[in-house]
Regions:
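Short hydrophobic clusters on alpha-helical segments that form packing/core surfaces
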Residues: 27, 31-39, 81, 85, ...
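Helix-turn-helix
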Residues: 30, 38-72, 76
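Hydrophobic alpha-helical connector segments
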Residues: 76, 90-118, 166-173, 203
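Amphipathic alpha-helical packing segments from all-alpha helical-bundle domains
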Residues: 122, 131-157, 167-183, 201-208
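Alpha-helical DNA-contacting segments of helix-turn-helix folds
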Residues: 39, 67, 73-81, 127, ...
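Hydrophobic alpha-helical segments that form the core
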Residues: 3-8, 162-187, 196-213, 226-237
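N-terminal intrinsically disordered/low-complexity leader segments
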Residues: 1-26, 189, 218-257
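Short linear capping/connector segments at secondary-structure termini
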Residues: 91, 122-131, 190-191
Length: 257
């Protein structure tokens, strides 16, 4: 039986090239690192093969020895990113409580956005243009969302929440996470950047909102950083960049990651 998974479809775009030797694999890896660097700097639509070749310090023709086009190279880079993120999520330790069950994966997601804002932006661009990668990305998101949905059902057995309802809740909360992190790290919203200065800050805020939405109570956090700061903002009716509030926030210690 032939492979029909999104990953198999992406691999088939590369065609047959003699790149199995250790030297060839090393050079191929260096080209992928160059693709990643250029994607971070200028994005997919502006990228040219000459940019990648210059970044890698190779001739343009050598790029085509390893990849048929930029689209294939980009898909491999982004697939590696998705695979690495999935592996890190699977390796997270068992959470001590319901809050950590939300906070830890959200922190990992926020750290990925901070480290690779260009690649995260590119995920949307390439998924729009390459059906194989769109399928891979949707598959990854769907698996993650269904895991959240199953967790919701387990935590509320007496509520008799159906699969469709739990999925709807999971997608809504997941979209909130993607939307905020995209605004902070991809669009570089200055107002949000003033308040949510680190991935730990972003993860705490998102986890607190998620926790309150699910359990209708405050999370059991001993030393909240951002949620305490937001409470100050609301009570004082001040903007996020008000010096007094900014000074208060800067003196707080981030939640341990």
């Amino acid at each position: 039986m032939s492979e029909t998974t999104p990953k198999a479809a992406l691999r088939s775009r590369g065609g047959s090239r003699e790149t199995s030797s250790a030297r060839a694999q090393k050079r191929r890896g260096l080209i992928k690192l160059a693709v990643s660097a250029v994607l971070e700097r200028m994005g997919y639509r502006a990228m040219k093969v000459t940019d990648v070749a210059a970044e890698a310090g190779i001739a343009v023709g050598l790029f085509y020895h390893y990849f048929p086009d930029l689209c294939t190279a980009t898909c491999e880079v982004l697939t590696d990113l998705v695979d690495d993120l999935s592996a890190q999520l699977d390796a997270l330790p068992k959470p001590e409580d319901r809050y950590q069950a939300v906070y830890r994966p959200t922190l990992l997601w926020a750290q990925t956005y901070e480290q690779h804002p260009g690649l995260m932006r590119c995920l949307v661009q390439v998924a729009d243009e390459v059906p194989e990668f769109e399928a891979l990305w949707l598959q990854t998101n769907d698996a993650w969302t269904r895991r959240i949905a199953r967790s919701i059902v387990r935590q509320f057995p007496s509520a008799a929440i159906g699969e469709r309802m739990s999925l709807s809740i999971a997608y809504a909360l997941g979209s909130m996470i993607d939307g905020l992190l995209n605004e902070i790290y991809v669009h570089r919203n200055p107002a949000l950047g003033t308040l949510l200065k680190t991935p730990a800050h972003s993860a705490e805020l998102l986890a607190a909102i998620w926790y309150r939405a699910l359990y209708l109570e405050n999370p059991p956090v001993d030393m909240p950083v951002i949620t305490a700061g937001i409470e100050l903002l609301v009570r004082a009716r001040l903007d996020a960049d008000t010096p007094a509030v900014a000074s208060t926030l800067s003196g707080l210690t981030p939640t341990a990651d």
